[in-house]
Amino acid sequence: MPELVFFSGTMDCGKSTLALQIEHNRSARGLAGMIFTRDDRAGEGKLSSRLGLVTDAVEVGDGQDLYAHVVDHLSQGGRVDYVIADEAQFLAPDQIDQLARVVDDLDVDVYAFGITTDFRSKLFPGSQRLVELADRVEVLQVEALCWCGARATHNARTVGGVMVVEGAQVVVGDVAQSPDEIGYEVLCRRHHRRRMTSATARAAALSPDVLPVTAT
């Protein structure tokens, strides 16, 4: 039976790499897929991983009907044996419903990949709807690590290396930002709560300690 599967995790856990691997494995067996993405770091209409792999994809726009897009492709004689939706956290809840309809009405597997929570530890609406509708939710087993070495469970937004907790939910950035640019970093819960990024931890380590008073 076709399924709607949601592969979730923090940044740096290999979601897009797995999406590309699924695409490779199925296309190598002669299957035809359709790839959706939104706001990928490589630019519009691209699915990319941090390992440097990239392939073309359909850039999803606001209000776009994903079910209608698949049906239109089929009606023009195209094949769709599976659908991959990367950066699924950025999709609207209605678009997640449309992906579920692709599974139920067209008998096509849909593999969605996304981050569950934003930099404030709040669920993305698209991810929330996927958790509600998916036949399976798979938490990726490639663990991202906090700067302290603990398992990273939270996504932090940074400006110049300093964690921020206000702003729009969706701002495209990367983990390799230059000073004063918006970036993202994965943290363990403890350091997310303390708002301690790798940059602020380094700054604290380099700060001169108060010297002990010595007896004269």
UniProtKB/Swiss-Prot annotation:
It catalyses: thymidine + ATP = dTMP + ADP + H(+). One of its GO terms (cellular component) is cytosol. It is found in: Cytoplasm. Its EC number is 2.7.1.21. InterPro entries: P-loop_NTPase, Thymidine_kinase. One of its GO terms (molecular function) is ATP binding. The active site is at E87. This is Thymidine kinase. Keywords: ATP-binding, Cytoplasm, DNA synthesis, Kinase, Nucleotide-binding, Transferase. ATP binds at G9, T10, M11, D12, C13, G14, K15, S16, D86, E87, A88, Q89. One of its GO terms (biological process) is thymidine metabolic process. PANTHER family: THYMIDINE KINASE (PTHR11441), THYMIDINE KINASE, CYTOSOLIC (PTHR11441:SF0). Belongs to the thymidine kinase family.
